[in-house]
């Protein structure tokens, strides 16, 4: 399994899926090839590793910035120069040429980035496309973009029968490298559309100068092209995601829809919350910008003005400490009460205290939190991202299992919350619909059987 920024370092949807996935295949031995942002996370896990995990191979992107050159004078063939030039210019390279250069010929990335070939290419590129910038700024931007990627493709590749990556980004590069090196099947699973998510983040980012944003966005498009072209099968959680993958260049014949599943037996004993005069709303979510907790807080403040006896329980780890502090500051500024940050909890147990669930993310794939809410018979208010509308409304004739509203729209989110607060019979009916939908389409057993069949198919 090739993992990026998720298991076993942080809690979250992809991490929960990974843990349950490994757990569901006790007869399969796993090597976890984990990509993290910072080396300080080495060996610091939020999950206890399962018995069928034989090895955790860790690689951290910030180690690339500490890499030392060997001082070698490098010579490149015309083909190698051509593919390096494409990469630096943001055009699709022949990835296998680059893999051979850094894997077999053991070219040191720092030596390459100080070579006359590299300097000639980016000097020309700067003159042609970025003449208004200083060469120093341009050089260090390109270096910071390219060095982590090149560092990754120098890594020793663990041997496996199948390589399975959970994103098209850096993990997709490693999956492609493994496919090239050992000629074994490569499966790519996208829980969200990684390229689109990075694009949204970069457009809002303050750390990237405006005139470099397109370069960074294009880099992640190159990553997705690499992963899609090397993968034997590409899975998504819902049909709209498959359409996005095709738009990004994936061949239709490689695509599969493999929805997530939930262990419904964990929630079998969950009944309606006992009446206590309060309406309790839950958010099963890590504290991160992409989950848009601030809009949730603004919306809840509106709800609180309309309905006094209502509480908001935000259940999940702090993923972004700075954003968490900003959320606390916002709560103080608004003067809103009864918002409870619980930290990580046993969802199946805690959800017994809740009347319904809310999700205000600006980007999602197929949120596990919604499936868990449905399994517990809880209606949901969600933003219209990923497959949330598909989960809420369905096309199965069962009816609506909640309310789907536009992202970042605090007024409509608040109105949906108020509606479910004031209509207990309706939210219970919606919760029952959600439970039926999960039982029919989204169980863990169904999901795992889909992956087993896929593995058998690509190994033939």
Model-predicted segments: where are they?
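Conserved donor-binding/catalytic core segment of Leloir-type glycosyltransferases
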Residues: 271-302, 313
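A charged, aromatic-enriched C-terminal amphipathic alpha-helix characteristic of glycosyltransferases
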Residues: 425-456
């Amino acid at each position: 399994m090739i993992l990026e920024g998720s298991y076993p370092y942080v809690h979250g949807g992809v991490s929960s899926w990974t843990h349950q996935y490994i757990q569901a295949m006790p007869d399969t031995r796993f090597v976890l090839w984990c990509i993290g942002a910072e080396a300080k996370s080495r060996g610091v896990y939020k999950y206890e590793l399962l018995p069928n995990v034989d090895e955790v191979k860790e690689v951290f992107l910030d180690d690339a910035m500490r890499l030392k050159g060997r001082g070698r004078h490098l010579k490149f063939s015309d083909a190698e120069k051509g593919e390096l030039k494409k990469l630096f210019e943001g055009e699709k390279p022949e990835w296998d040429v680059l893999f051979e250069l850094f894997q077999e010929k053991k070219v040191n990335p720092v030596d390459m980035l100080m070579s006359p070939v590299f300097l000639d290419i980016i000097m020309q590129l700067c003159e042609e496309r970025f003449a208004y910038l200083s060469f120093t700024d341009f050089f260090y931007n390109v270096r910071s973009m390219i060095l982590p990627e090149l560092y990754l493709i120098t890594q020793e590749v663990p041997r496996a029968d199948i390589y399975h990556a959970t994103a098209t980004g850096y993990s997709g590069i490693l999956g492609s490298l493994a496919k090239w090196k050992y000629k074994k099947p490569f499966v790519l699973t996208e829980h969200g559309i990684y390229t689109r998510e990075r694009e949204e983040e970069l457009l809002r980012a303050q750390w990237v100068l405006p005139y470099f944003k397109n370069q960074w966005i294009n880099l992640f498009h190159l990553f997705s092209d690499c992963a899609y072209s090397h993968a034997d099968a590409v899975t998504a959680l819902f049909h709209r995601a498959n359409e996005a993958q095709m738009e990004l260049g994936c061949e239709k014949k490689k695509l599969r829809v493999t929805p997530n599943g939930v262990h419904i037996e964990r929630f079998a004993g969950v009944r309606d919350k006992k009446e206590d005069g309060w309406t309790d709303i839950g958010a099963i979510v890590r504290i991160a910008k992409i989950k848009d907790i601030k809009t949730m807080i603004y919306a809840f403040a509106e709800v609180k003005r309309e309905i006094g006896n209502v509480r908001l329980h935000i259940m999940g780890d702090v993923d972004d400490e700075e954003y968490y502090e900003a959320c606390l500051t916002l709560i103080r500024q608004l003067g809103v009460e009864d918002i409870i940050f619980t930290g990580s909890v046993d969802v199946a147990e805690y959800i017994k205290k809740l009347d319904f669930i809310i999700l205000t993310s600006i980007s999602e794939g197929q949120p596990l939190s919604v499936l868990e809410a449905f399994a517990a018979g809880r209606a949901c208010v969600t933003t219209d991202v990923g497959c949330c509308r598909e989960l809420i409304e369905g096309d199965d004739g069962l009816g609506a299992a909640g309310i789907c509203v536009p992202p970042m729209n605090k007024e409509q989110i608040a109105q949906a919350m108020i509606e479910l607060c004031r209509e207990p019979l309706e939210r219970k009916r919606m919760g029952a619909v959600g439970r039926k939908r999960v039982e029919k389409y989204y169980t863990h057993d169904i999901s795992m059987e889909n992956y087993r069949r896929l593995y058998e198919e690509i190994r033939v």
